């Protein structure tokens, strides 16, 4: 597995991300929770098309692995589009800045 990164934002919290074959995969539960879905797992099932499972280090025990649900960028935008929160647009701008510019402070 590639190294996990954590993208942090004061408004949206932390999003765990891995890079695989030059593309980012986002922790689906982190994204759905940041976008205000009351049931993040259900939101992933209903809106995401290309869900993948990857092993990641266990947060309390780095020697152990846990299986996590990751989504590609296209599914990230699907969750944004279906979110009913007004902050979804700000979330989209923040992620876009992280992925496509060097200034992610916006």
Question: Could you say what each language-model-derived stretch is?
Answer:
Residues 32-37:
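Non-catalytic, well-ordered alpha-helical segments in soluble enzyme domains
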Residues 20-21, 74, 101:
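A short, sequence-level motif marking secondary-structure junctions
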Residues 12, 39-63:
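Major-groove DNA-recognition helix of helix-turn-helix-type DNA-binding domains
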Residues 1-29:
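N-terminal intrinsically disordered, low-complexity, charged/polar
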Residues 100-106:
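Conserved small/polar residues in nucleotide/adenosyl-binding loops
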């Amino acid at each position: 597995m590639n190294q996990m990164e954590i993208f942090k934002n004061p408004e949206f919290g932390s999003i765990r991300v891995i890079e695989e074959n030059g593309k980012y995969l986002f922790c689906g539960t982190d994204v759905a929770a940041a976008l205000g879905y009351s049931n993040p797992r259900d939101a992933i099932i209903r809106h995401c098309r290309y869900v993948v499972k990857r092993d990641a280090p266990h947060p309390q025990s780095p020697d152990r692995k846990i299986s996590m649900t990751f989504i590609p960028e296209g599914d990230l935008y699907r969750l944004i589009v279906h979110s009913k929160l007004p902050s979804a647009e700000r979330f989209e701008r923040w992620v876009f800045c992280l992925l496509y510019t060097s200034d992610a402070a916006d």
